[in-house]
């Protein structure tokens, strides 16, 4: 099939590349000419395992193209994906200005029947809005469908190529058939294509992400209670998650959720609920717990060292909001580091992939180390903020020698309290008093 994907951000770039990988001819459209030139030369602006290699191979095999000519790209395509950003507005709602701008341009470019796909995460009712905008610009037939993405950063390529389900919101049999044909090669293992009405598909993305956010906040709430009553949060987690009705995913205590999806989608769903006369108390509480969780971690540090940290330097391991990505949007590290800086602390930080991203957030306010062990030199404590694999089994003897005092604040519950305390460390984690 001939496809255009409008927007070369995280979602658009992964979707376009993976669709090309299955033999489709894909044009990725963006108005940033410098970015497009870099992509043509195999320079990828985001870190996502396997993506760079796949872009290079599909570009060289003439299946994947990058263009700033939206009109020509739409004219050549049967399916047009809208994958532009929907940034959070001041009131928590999703800002649809880019979606609406693209819809208007698509309408002007349509020359025959097209399937227009909302791939961006958008509020319920957006497809109707897009349809009305396009109708004003063209007399040609078209259908607008919703096809939300469920990609995990750090595993996005695998998630797209081997999805556990594909959700298609469509009110048109013609569009549904085309979308089923498009996704057939991705679902040879028998995982389902779930066909539903457009509004239900739009709601599904928000419902799924908000549920996962609630699970994370629930795990953190339980861990905080465990600390107060003297229970072991890890043992409680294991006992609870052994129940098949509950399962183990997204129930690990830590520093809360971050990234480009969960925080934004939770707030957007709350806004949608409130705007339609519904209370979203459970979801609102998850958001509050998430914000508080980072500050509780800072409180652990100040409880030990005192409120004045002007003579303290901390090593930070991990800046990205999760492993296997360089994304720092809504990362716990931002809140925690800024809070420590305000109290006078100095920071020496290291992350395997997010160092350049961190410079955008912190500039020269912190020191950037070249390795995890360099970050430890002459610091008063180690703060583990992201659970990268290379931090899971470090050389603790080396850590002890490099730190001025052998203290670890583990925000991801990666290490064994028993073994570290036996080795002479002072150890703080989440959910253990």
Language model features: what each stretch is:
Residues 1-433:
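Structural/interface elements that position substrates and couple domains in central-metabolism enzymes
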């Amino acid at each position: 099939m001939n496809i255009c994907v409008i927007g070369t951000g995280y979602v658009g770039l992964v979707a376009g590349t993976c669709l090309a990988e299955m033999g489709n001819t894909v044009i990725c459209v963006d108005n940033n000419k410098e970015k497009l030139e870099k992509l043509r030369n195999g320079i990828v602006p985001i870190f996502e395992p396997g993506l760079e290699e796949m872009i290079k191979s599909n570009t060289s095999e003439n299946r994947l193209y990058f263009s700033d000519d939206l009109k020509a790209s739409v004219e050549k395509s049967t399916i047009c994906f809208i994958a532009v950003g929907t940034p959070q507005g001041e009131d928590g709602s999703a800002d649809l200005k880019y979606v609406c701008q693209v819809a208007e341009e698509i309408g002007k470019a349509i020359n025959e029947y097209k399937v227009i796909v909302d791939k961006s995460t958008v509020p319920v009712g957006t497809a109707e809005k897009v349809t009305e905008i396009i109708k004003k610009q063209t007399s040609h037939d078209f259908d607008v469908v919703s096809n939300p993405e469920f990609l995990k950063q750090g595993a996005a390529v695998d998630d797209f190529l081997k999805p556990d389900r594909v959700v298609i919101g469509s009110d048109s049999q013609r569009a549904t058939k085309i979308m089923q044909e498009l996704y057939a090669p991705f679902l040879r293992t028998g995982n389902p294509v779930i066909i539903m009405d457009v509004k239900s598909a739009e709601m599904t993305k928000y419902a799924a992400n908000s549920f996962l956010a609630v699970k994370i906040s629930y795990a953190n709430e339980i861990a905080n209670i465990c600390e107060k009553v003297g229970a072991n949060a890890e043992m409680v987690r294991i006992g609870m998650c052994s129940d098949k009705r509950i399962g183990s995913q997204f129930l690990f205590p830590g520093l809360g959720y971050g990234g480009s999806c969960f925080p934004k989608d939770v707030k957007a769903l709350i806004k949608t609920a409130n705007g339609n006369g519904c209370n979203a108390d459970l979801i609102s509480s998850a958001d509050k717990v998430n914000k508080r969780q980072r500050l509780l971690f800072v409180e652990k540090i100040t409880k030990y060292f005192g409120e004045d940290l002007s003579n303290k330097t901390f090593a930070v391991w991990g800046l990205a909001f999760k492993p296997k990505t360089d994304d720092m949007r809504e990362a716990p590290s931002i809140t925690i580091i800024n809070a420590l800086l305000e109290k006078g602390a100095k920071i020496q930080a290291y992350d395997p992939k997010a160092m350049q991203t961190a410079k955008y957030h912190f500039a020269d306010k912190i020191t950037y180390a070249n390795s995890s062990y360099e970050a430890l030199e002459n610091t008063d404590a180690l703060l583990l903020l992201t659970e990268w694999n290379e931090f899971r089994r470090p050389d603790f003897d080396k850590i002890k020698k490099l730190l001025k005092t052998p203290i670890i604040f583990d925000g991801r519950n990666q290490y064994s309290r028993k073994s570290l305390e036996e080795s002479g460390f002072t150890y703080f984690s989440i959910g253990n008093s």
